[in-house]
Amino acid sequence: KIGEQLTAMWRQIADTFADFDQHVIFEGMNEPRAQGMNYEWSGNAACYAAINYLNQVFVNTIRKDAKGYNAERCLMIPGYAATSSPAGTAAIALPTVDGEAAANIIVSVHSYDPQTFCLQDTQTTFEPEKDGAKINRVFENIKETFLDRGIPVVMGETGATNTNGNHDERAKWAYCVAQNAQRYGVPIVIWDNGNNQTSGGECHAWIRRAVNPKLRSQATSVVYPQVLDALWEGKNSAAWGSALTEVRAEADESILW
């Protein structure tokens, strides 16, 4: 039934956006998981198989009788819960078309590492050496699992929660993540959930969305510019794809727009 619903939804989306060029990328699902179960975020073999099935349904829907740009459009697929863990990423089965590996598939992962700093409010400081090693392991796993096989990856969500205004510490995190993303050739998307609180975890507001008319001049401004500035500094500190093999780094250039 879920497969039928996914097909019906994506058929409408695909038809509507068929004539939009390759700047439009479709992502089949967002953090698909067994909500409410004690294994909601870790999953198991049955969970992994279910998501692989739904990813195949998604690709079949877009590629079958494809109109406009849909025959070659880039399609993003997540693993279970969009995890970036070694177990979760290893379980991802790439979709096929007519028995061959589907073209223009991008794996989507989400990463909030270390979780005690990025999602919760139990860790207020970021230690570049210790915590940076955790971030590096995430990207190294992405490299070994996908990039070394010529499979592109987008980190579709990442971020660090605001804990009592620890913006200098978040800036250290931002620099580290952006530097790794640049070195491994993995685009990242910063998650903004609009939560402007300063405690309780998952306070991921980055853009000010003012509703008070007196604050209209501040609307859509960046809330924590020092953290976003650190992202650019991290990006500019390394060459794109420099952690990859020479062949892979050259191949990456062909998928950049």
Positions of PLM-derived features:
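Surface-exposed, active-site-proximal loop segments in enzymatic domains
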Residues: K1-I2, A34-N44, D121-T124, E169, ...
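Aromatic-rich peripheral "rim/lid" segments of glycoside hydrolase catalytic domains that contact
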Residues: G165-W257
